[in-house]
């Protein structure tokens, strides 16, 4: 039985996944769910990005990050011959990221306001670090299940995905800057 059958609620499923209680395979392997979670993930990335970059650049970056996540996850799953888990894995990654947006966005706005005022807050920085570490645990949990590996393998997969997203984001920002110049 899937989480969405009966009276289950999708938001509750993603929160439970953030608490490491559910696995990606507990979600339905639904293309509709994947599309919905990818769209919401892209929109939340866009909202985060417009804090620091111009609107067109934020849109391109948000779309690029989503494409990178899809490509990298599909490549990882292909390496372990588990491509059938793609929809659930991607839905889990996108959905849990959206859940983390809820505490992350106000924290990001606070840190941005402090930076613009030339100030720092150890509390804000510590909370941001804790949120990042927790997001790695969530991603590691998702990858551990999707790749049928140990938690440490999930951590390496999570770190690899984050590193690839970072490199791709810088490359896209450079490209957008060159096109806009």
Regions found by a protein language model. Give the residues of each.
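Short secondary-structure boundary micro-motifs
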Residues: 1-2, 8-10, 119, 128-130
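Short, strongly hydrophobic alpha-helical membrane anchors
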Residues: 1-3, 180-181
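Selected alpha-helical membrane-embedding segments in polytopic membrane proteins
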Residues: 2-91, 95-97
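Membrane interfacial helix motifs at helix-loop boundaries and amphipathic/re-entrant anchors
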Residues: 49-59, 115-120, 173-176
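Transmembrane alpha-helix boundary/anchor motif
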Residues: 67-75, 137-138, 167, 171
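Hydrophobic alpha-helical transmembrane segments and adjacent short intramembrane/lumenal linkers
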Residues: 82-154, 158, 164, 168
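Juxtamembrane boundary at the C-terminal end of a transmembrane helix
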Residues: 167-181
């Amino acid at each position: 039985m899937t989480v969405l059958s009966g009276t289950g609620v999708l938001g509750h499923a993603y929160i439970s996944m953030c608490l490491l209680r559910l696995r990606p395979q507990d979600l339905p392997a639904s293309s509709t769910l994947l599309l919905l979670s990818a769209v919401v993930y892209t929109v939340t990335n866009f909202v985060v990005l417009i804090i620091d970059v111009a609107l067109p650049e934020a849109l391109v970056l948000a779309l690029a990050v989503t494409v990178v996540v899809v490509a990298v996850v599909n490549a990882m799953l292909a390496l372990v011959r588990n491509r059938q888990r793609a929809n659930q894995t991607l839905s889990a990654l996108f959905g849990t990221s959206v859940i983390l947006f809820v505490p992350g966005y106000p924290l990001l706005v606070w840190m941005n306001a402090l930076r613009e005022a030339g100030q720092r807050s150890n509390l804000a920085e510590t909370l941001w670090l804790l949120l990042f570490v927790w997001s790695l645990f969530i991603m590691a949990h998702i990858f551990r299940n999707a790749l049928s590996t140990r938690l440490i393998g999930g951590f390496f997969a999570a770190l690899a995905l984050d590193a690839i997203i970072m490199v791709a984001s810088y490359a896209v920002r450079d490209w957008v800057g060159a096109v806009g110049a």
